[in-house]
């Protein structure tokens, strides 16, 4: 936690973004994030591409290409962390100041979706499988994890649009949220098993 939220101090020193929102509740509970959080979001918006895509690392010192550049679970930090800040401090400044960038990212995810399902990314990274093989998501389909983040982003963007007084965007994201939830349920909801895929761990969860 010095300038950049690095993955670890000994090997992966880049600012991998998923950790920021995943440990966000702990960060906001234990530390004064009033300076660091806005800096993280500035790094993200500085790194954001012209089409709205948010790379997996910010600052982006190196581009890994393909999946390692673009994953919803990582990029969604631009949407999720400003709301964690708002929930902790009651300050919506980060949301209102970065609203356009947040819109561009969610609109980018929409452009990558097919029938409401987002299918790209790294998924549930480093889940454990028999034999110790790690890395890419093995137990849970990438579309399930990616689309779940997309849904959460749409829900938050509906709130963000309301905060800035943009009725058109509020209706847009609210309507899209409902449509994507329906698509998610059609794709992944099984009445006897709740939300599931063919993976055993999914059925258990």
Question: What label would you give each PLM region?
Answer:
Residues 70, 74, 94, 139-149:
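Extracytoplasmic/periplasmic, Sec-exported soluble proteins
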Residues 17-20, 147, 203:
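Short runs of predominantly hydrophobic/aromatic residues within well-ordered alpha helices
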Residues 144-194:
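Active-site neighborhood of glycoside hydrolase catalytic domains
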Residues 195-205:
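Single conserved hydrophobic/aromatic residue that forms the stacking wall/gate
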Residues 55-67, 126-143, 187-191:
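Acidic/His metal-coordination segments adjacent to aromatic residues that form catalytic metal sites
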Residues 117-125, 147, 153:
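Core alpha/beta catalytic barrel or barrel-like domain that forms the active/cofactor pocket
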Residues 1-111, 117-122:
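Substrate-binding groove/exosite segments of carbohydrate-active enzymes
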Residues 6-10, 93-95, 167-171, 192-197:
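Short, surface-exposed loop/turn segments at secondary-structure junctions
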């Amino acid at each position: 936690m010095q300038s950049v939220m690095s993955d670890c101090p000994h090997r992966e020193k880049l600012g991998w973004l998923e950790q920021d929102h995943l440990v966000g509740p702990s960060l906001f509970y234990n530390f004064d994030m009033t300076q660091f959080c806005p800096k993280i979001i500035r790094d993200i918006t500085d790194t954001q591409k012209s089409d709205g895509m948010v790379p997996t690392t910010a600052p982006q010192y190196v581009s890994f290409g393909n999946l390692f550049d673009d994953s919803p679970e990582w990029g969604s930090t631009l949407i999720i962390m400003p709301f964690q800040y708002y929930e902790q401090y009651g300050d919506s400044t980060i949301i209102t100041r970065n609203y356009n960038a947040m819109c561009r990212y969610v609109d980018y995810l929409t452009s990558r979706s097919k029938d409401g399902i987002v299918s790209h990314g790294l998924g549930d990274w480093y889940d454990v499988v028999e034999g110790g093989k790690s890395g890419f998501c093995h137990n849970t389909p990438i579309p399930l994890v990616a689309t779940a983040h997309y849904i959460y982003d749409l829900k938050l963007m509906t709130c963000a649009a309301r905060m800035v007084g943009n009725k058109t965007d509020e209706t847009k994201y609210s309507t899209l949220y409902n449509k994507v939830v329906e698509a998610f349920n059609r794709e992944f909801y099984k009445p006897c098993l709740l939300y599931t895929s063919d993976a055993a761990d999914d059925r258990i969860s």
